């Protein structure tokens, strides 16, 4: 079986948020889809190991923030490669509350949809949470971030708990003639040809010439967490 066929499927990139008691948590997800229009019903796939999974079950609802294409990698890193068990993911984040009191991102978000959980489907490592939309609004005009754009243009990577993660797929196989370095935490690849313009690193800057305080654009790891590939 050629599993590369799965790579032809298209996805978006979203922040899924939920509430448990007086605490908020959220994560990046790419498997979000509309099921029906009357009533408007949406679904999201969440790994059972993730804290957000626990929060959705406890709060019986969730919010989807539709990310804009221009979203910084650092925001994706905060919600996609860090655990809410170890930190407050909303620290330093500009967010607002939906009608149901659930958080959504106020910046870099085209729209949000709040859903009341009405069904959970067991999908092995993941649960598919199905909910009826109870609140929604368009916040910005623009192009949504897609999974393909995130990987091909932003050079982003996939958390191991994502439904689309494939072992070995995140390793860059580029020849060593143009040395690239890969983050051992989140698999981000620093390419000297492209640099890191978002953080002031010009294209053509070798990894060795990066400032000592430079950190991974996605997860924030230091240079010592990178290995040549």
From Swiss-Prot:
Cofactor entry: Fe cation; FMN
Chain residues that bind Fe cation: 183, 186, 216, 219
Matching InterPro entries: Flavin_Rdtase-like_dom, Rubredoxin-like_dom, Rubredoxin_dom, Rubredoxin_ET, Rubredoxin_Fe_BS, Split_barrel_FMN-bd
GO biological process: alkane catabolic process
GO MF: electron transfer activity; FMN binding; iron ion binding; oxidoreductase activity, acting on the CH-NH group of donors, NAD or NADP as acceptor
Domain of life: Bacteria
One Pfam family hit: Flavin_Reduct
Triggers of expression: Constitutively expressed.
Keywords tagged on the record: Electron transport, Flavoprotein, FMN, Iron, Metal-binding, Oxidoreductase, Transport
Region (Flavodoxin-reductase-like): 1-158
Record note on cofactor: Binds 2 iron ions per homodimer. Binds 2 FMN per homodimer. The occupancy is 1.3-1.9.
Domain spans labelled Rubredoxin-like: 178-229
Function: Has nitric oxide reductase activity in combination with FprA; probably involved in nitrosative stress protection. Acts as an NADH:FprA oxidoreductase.
Subunit and interaction comment: Homodimer.
Family from the record: In the N-terminal section; belongs to the flavodoxin reductase family.
Protein name per UniProt: High molecular weight rubredoxin
Species of provenance: Moorella thermoacetica (strain ATCC 39073 / JCM 9320)
């Amino acid at each position: 079986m050629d599993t590369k066929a799965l790579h032809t499927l298209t996805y978006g990139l979203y922040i899924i948020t939920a509430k448990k008691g007086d605490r908020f948590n959220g994560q990046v997800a790419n498997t979000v889809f509309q099921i029906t229009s009357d009533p408007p019903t949406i679904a999201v796939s969440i790994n059972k190991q993730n804290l957000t999974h626990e929060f959705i079950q406890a709060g019986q609802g969730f919010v989807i923030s539709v990310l804009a294409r221009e979203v910084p990698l650092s925001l994706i890193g905060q919600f996609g490669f860090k655990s809410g068990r170890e930190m407050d993911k909303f620290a330093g984040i500009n967010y607002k509350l939906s009608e149901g009191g659930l958080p959504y991102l106020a910046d870099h978000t085209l729209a949000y949809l709040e859903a009341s959980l009405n069904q959970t489907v067991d999908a092995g490592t993941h649960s598919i949470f199905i909910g009826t939309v109870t609140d929604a609004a368009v916040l910005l005009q623009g192009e949504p971030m897609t999974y393909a754009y995130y990987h091909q243009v932003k050079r982003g990577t996939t958390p191991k708990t994502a439904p689309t993660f494939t072992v070995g797929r995140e390793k860059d196989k580029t020849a060593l003639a143009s040395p690239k370095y890969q983050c051992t935490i989140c698999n981000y690849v620093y390419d000297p040809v492209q640099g890191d313009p978002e953080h002031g690193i010009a294209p053509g800057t070798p990894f060795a010439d990066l400032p000592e305080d430079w950190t991974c654009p996605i997860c924030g790891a230091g240079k010592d967490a990178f290995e040549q590939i």
